[in-house]
């Protein structure tokens, strides 16, 4: 009982923080954290099978920064940035890869000019100018995580110095937003217009990829006007944690408090091509979605954690939709 009470107080203190939007949207690399990390991500996709993804993570002077910049054109294949884009700049910038806020909390510009590599290993020239436009306010995951379930997971764990050191990874600030991605990509002098559904996230705090066991992260939008994000993560020092939200067509936001577990989603295949996930909401509602993976962008984090960002089609409460399907696994523990 004492552990349970202490755990609930710990979670309550962590989840009570609220930062102004103009502060949230800045880069935060706190060198006092065990594993400093500021990570942001943009994704876009359309029903024709075109997709775009970019991510930057700034991790302090002692760890290598992370970068993703990849896209798929349905008739041309996959292209991506395979070499370091350059030194960290002011704000969200690594070399020629740059993101700039146009309107805080709503609109961001993504630009890149340089080389990308195709599936055949050949280099191509690329110029990118995209705008992400949010459809609703940013959603802080501190509002959606079920504090009772988190406290239960903490209380049931063995408490020692190592546990509390690793627990700092769960104290990140993390928010997301769905919307649209528009603009153009010029590939080898040919301009391709981009008009996609989009999603973005931003998190900062401490992150040590080697303590992650496995996870999935699902985000998308249905033709009926629902958009959603749900994630469930299992660490090697802590049980499964779940968070997420559903934005209804009228703009009402409902928090995800539980979802189908990792083992059930992957019962037939560790990296499933499709599966059904049930969402339990704070309002008492439930939603059912089925995803279908259509190719993916692979990444490896800190040489240990495998990430697969898949182009996704959905049925959300039986209505068609599209989005992104992310699965991750610790390479020492799982073999695909």
Q: Where do the language-model regions lie?
A:
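Structured soluble/peripheral alpha/beta segments that form catalytic or ligand/cofactor-binding pockets
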Residues: 1-336
């Amino acid at each position: 009982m004492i552990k349970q009470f202490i755990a609930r107080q710990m979670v309550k203190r962590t989840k009570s923080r609220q930062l102004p939007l103009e502060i949230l949207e800045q880069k935060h690399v706190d060198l006092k954290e065990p594993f400093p990390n500021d990570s942001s991500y943009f994704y876009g996709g359309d029903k024709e099978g075109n997709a775009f993804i970019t991510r930057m993570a700034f991790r302090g002077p002692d760890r290598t920064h992370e970068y993703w910049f990849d896209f798929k054109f349905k008739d041309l294949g996959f292209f991506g940035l395979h070499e370091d884009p350059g030194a960290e700049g002011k704000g969200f910038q690594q070399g020629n890869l740059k993101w700039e806020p146009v309107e805080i909390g709503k609109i961001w510009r993504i630009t890149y000019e340089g080389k990308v590599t195709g599936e055949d290993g050949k280099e191509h020239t690329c110029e990118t100018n995209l705008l992400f436009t949010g459809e609703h306010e940013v959603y802080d995951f501190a509002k959606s995580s079920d504090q009772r379930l988190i406290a239960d997971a903490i209380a049931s764990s063995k408490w020692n110095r190592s546990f509390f050191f690793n627990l700092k990874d769960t104290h990140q600030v993390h928010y997301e937003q769905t919307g649209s991605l528009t603009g153009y990509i010029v590939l080898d002098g040919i301009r391709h217009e981009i008009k996609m559904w989009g999603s973005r996230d931003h998190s900062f705090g401490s992150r040590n990829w080697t303590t992650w066991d496995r996870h999935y992260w699902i985000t998308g939008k249905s033709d009926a006007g629902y958009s959603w994000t749900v994630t469930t993560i299992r660490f090697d020092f802590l049980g499964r944690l779940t968070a997420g939200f559903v934005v209804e067509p009228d703009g009402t936001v409902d928090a995800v408090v539980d979802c189908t577990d990792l083992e059930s989603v992957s019962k037939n295949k560790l990296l499933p091509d499709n599966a059904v996930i049930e969402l339990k909401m704070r309002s008492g509602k439930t939603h059912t979605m089925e995803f279908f993976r259509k190719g993916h962008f692979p990444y490896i984090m800190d040489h240990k954690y495998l990430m697969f960002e898949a182009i996704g089609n959905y049925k959300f409460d039986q209505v068609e939709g599209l989005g992104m399907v992310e699965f991750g696994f610790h390479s020492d523990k799982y073999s695909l």
